[in-house]
Structure formats: structure tokens, C-alpha cells
Amino acid sequence: MYKYLHILNDIENKIQNGDIKEGKKLPSIRSLVTQYECNKATVIRALHELEKRHIIYSVPQSGYYVVKKSENTIENNEIIDFASSAPDPDVFPYLDFQHCINKAIDTYKNDLFVYGTPKGLPSLIPVIQKQLANYQVFTKEENIFITSGVQQALAILTSIPFPNGNETVLIEQPTYHLYIDYLEINKVPVIGIKRTNEGIDLNELEQIFQTGKIKFFYTIPRYHHPLGISYSKDEKEKIALLAKKYNVFIVEDDYLADLETDSKADPLYSLDNCSHVIYLKSYSKIIFPGLRVGVAVIPPSIANAFYTYKKILDIDSPMISQAALEIYIKSGMFERHKNKIKSSYYNRSIKLAKTLEKVQNENPSLFTYNRQNTSGIHTCLEIQKNIVTETLIQKLGDIQISVDTIDKNYMRDFPKEKLLKLNVSNIKEDKIEEGIRKIIEEIKQLRQFNFQFRKE
């Protein structure tokens, strides 16, 4: 990363985290030169970029100051929202992406009026191919499909015939709730396999692969939704070997690949010979859900069927979004934004983990939390069986704390764990401990109430 981008990201994160307050003056250029061990021109370039993004402003003969946000923004942040998994709107560079949209309309204005690119915008595909290589996903252009989000890719994969001739889909429990809804509404044969902080039972997985007539296994190896855990390299290798042995396809949903902090954490796709693993990538968490652009890397054995169904279902995925994304990636803006949001979310995830460990040590019997080696934007707490979660959620809502259970992430008849989901993508770092302590206080009160009720 260029030095000025490092300085820019660092200052921006400090502003977002409240280390540098709104309306306050930044350190002098001379101080920043010393702090970041660089030359004056590099610091000035970073400051000019921040000024262009309306994050800071300059006062002649005085220095640079942090822009004050509107009162409405501050009011909206009063709710401490652990329930939402949407990206933080405050860290999205609206002006940058607006510029890319305008540029896309100017550049591709003729293409916007033409039907017939079901594989995706032709000029975007090689850009995506190059980007995927950074995630250790090496593939040919003809295997890359641009879809209207990962949900569309899942719908197509569920519908098309597979070479193994099987029809049953295997999913982790819990998993992505909208895919569960899709399977149930369309009456697709489905089997669930339990996933916990310890992973999945590989012996059970092999038994299901061997006898269950499985079409494909839908899995979220990295930063699992909603558990927040990741498979180890050993687990991924064993899953890939089992898939090949029993001719079962793997659908790998790598929706948080851009937030990975471990450079050695390669996707499951990289461990396969590209014949049994289908790789899905989303931009909804790193940019915004409304972009409606996803990427599917499809093996040659099902590429024609995927193309045909995609064309029938949706002639084009959003062309303006695709064109804007191409410009956003090629300009280097995507990489800069990725580094900024990854740093911001990483700091929040570490704050969440440390707070939960501290609070658990203070209240050892109140809830169960197992810190993972990986630090994602969400995790789960196991609460006592006698706590009525609906009551807890209602009481927390009354004091402006939003949380949720993971009940909807289970199939209807699958045994559910009593887990409380905590997501920090929409919470400022300095609000995390306050929110956690309020949650714990409400759990204490409900436990005390239950204890008194039993005594009476």
C-alpha cells in the first residue's frame, strides 16, 4: 500500500473511532511527518485526499480540522445495533462511488441499451479474474459469471442438474437464513449437518456424502454466518478430499473474503482441482447490498447449464452496477476502501472479543463465550436455557439496544441452540463495551427474576 494511503486510512479510522473528535484540529503537518516517518509531500497528499472526501477541512494559517457531522447522524447512532449485518454507512465513500457511476454511464452509455450479456459485462470479467487471483482463486474467464448477488447464484445452482445426478442439498446448521427459506419454499430435498465452534463432525459428513445422494454441500468456511467461526486449513483439506471421493460438489460462500486479516487463510476452492468446488463472492458487505453484484466461479461441467438458466432467469445483472464496480476496482478505490473498512471492522471485532472475555470473567456462570482464533464482525453468546430470549430482546429494545437470536438460521425441524447473535458492523468501537454491559445487566435481571419465581 502507498504510504499516503496508510496515513489517510489511519487518520480516517481515528476520526471514526472517536480518537480525533469532530471539530477538533489535526496534528500539524510537521508532527504527522515525524509520526509517520515520511516526507512532507506524502502527508500533504493524504490530507488533500481527506479534504476532497469532506472528512476534514483546512483553515488558512491555522491547520486542518475534522468536519462536524449533522445532528441527524448523531441521533441515528443512539441505537446500539448488534442485530444488523449491513455494512456501516459511515465508512462508505459515497462521493467516490457516485463518481464511478457517473463515469460508467458516460463510458458505457451505448451498452446500457443492449440486451444479452448473461455472463456479465465483458470488460468486468477480466478485472474480476485478476482480483480473484488475490484470494488464491485462479480460474479462466469463461468460468466466471456475474450474478445479481449471491442469492441468485444459489437459486440457479439449486435449479440446474448436476453431473452426479443427485438432488439433495446439504447445508450447515445454522446457516444463511434466506437460503433456508428458498429451499423450504421450493420444496428442495435438504439435509442439515450441525456446525459449532468446534467445526463439524467429519465422520458424519462422510457418512452423509456416502449415503445421502448429495447434489452439493453449501458451506460458509470463512467467518461463518451467523457463528462467526472459520474452518482450519486441515478441515478444509478434508472436506475437499471427501467431496472428490464421493463426487459431491461444494458451494463455497466466501461473502467476507475482503475482511480476512490472515494472509494464509486461503479459500476451500484453492485446495481443489477446480472440478468439485463452486466459489461464490459477494460485494454486499464490503460496498453495499444495493449494488446487487455477485461473482460465481463455475466448473466447466455445469457452466453451460448455469449459463442457460441465468439467461432465462435474468438476461442481465445490473449493468450500471457492473460498470461502476469495474471502474471502482481498476482505479484502486476498491483496494483503498477495502483496507479502510477491514481495519475498522478488525478493531471492532477485537474490542468485542476482549469485552466479552472480560465480562465473562466477571460473570462466569451467566453465559458461554468461546473466543476464536479468527476475529470476525459477528459472534454468538450461549445463554442459559431458562432465559426467555423474546423477553430479553424486548427489554433491550426498550433501552435502545438491538440484538437477535439465530433461530431463523435453522431449518424448521432442526434442533436449535440458544444463541444470541452479536454483530458489530454497525456499532462504533467506543459503544461496544457499553452495549455489551447493558446486555449482561438485562440477562442478570432476568435470571434473578426466574430465581425468585422458582422460590415462590
Language-model features: locations:
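Hydrophobic residues in beta-strands of the RecA-like P-loop NTPase core, especially within AAA+ ATPase
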Residues: 171, 251-252
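N-terminal basic, amphipathic alpha-helical segments
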Residues: 1-104, 110-116, 124-130, 311-318, ...
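Conserved core of the PLP fold type I
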Residues: 112-246, 258-259, 263-271, 450-454
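PLP-dependent aminotransferase class I/II
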Residues: 278-362, 370-371
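Short, solvent-exposed loop/turn elements at beta->coil junctions and helix N-caps
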Residues: 283, 367-368, 407-411
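Residue-level marker for buried hydrophobic side chains located in beta-strands
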Residues: 82, 250-251
